[in-house]
Amino acid sequence: MKKILLFPGAFNPPHNGHAEAVETVLRKESFDELWIVPSGKRDDKTIATSYEDRRAMGNLFVEYLQSKINIPVKLITAELNNIDGKFTHEILKEIKSQPDIDVMQLIGSDGFLDLQKGKLIDSQEKFIVMNRNGYELPKNFSLNENRVIFDGTTQSISSTQIRNMVKNHDIGYKKLVPEKITSFIEGNRLYF
């Protein structure tokens, strides 16, 4: 059975904090493949960046990760292509139902808390929850074999912060984003 680390998110844009989260997990856990799953339509966020631009940045992020880690990395664009209104949890269930794969989902504590609130978590789903500043899990959070918490030293970066930095012409964002993605953002005038 192939062991997959599934990493869903907006990735608008992908940044060094995302890469660092993956590297932190892979130092402690082993997987056969990493699947990056950019989200499509969302109830909680408006995503103005086009499908084509997000897919292109996703491909650049896969290339960047592939240079840093020793397992294959795939970009899963099922949700970006989503025209029938399915949301992340529905598409992830379809992915996880594939035979011969064991899927563990990497998610920030903010996303996990949102899923819990919406009662979108099946007790059998496997998660690695990466603590994010400002979104600490409750002290009574129940751990089991399907729930692993990482109190990693990942950078406290958000894609929203990066978009705002670009919009405000703060070149400090270039230290937070892989170089080829920075070039893509500038070349396509994203977030300006």
Question: Which role fits each region the language model picked out?
Answer:
Residues M1-F192:
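Nucleotidyltransferase catalytic core that binds NTPs
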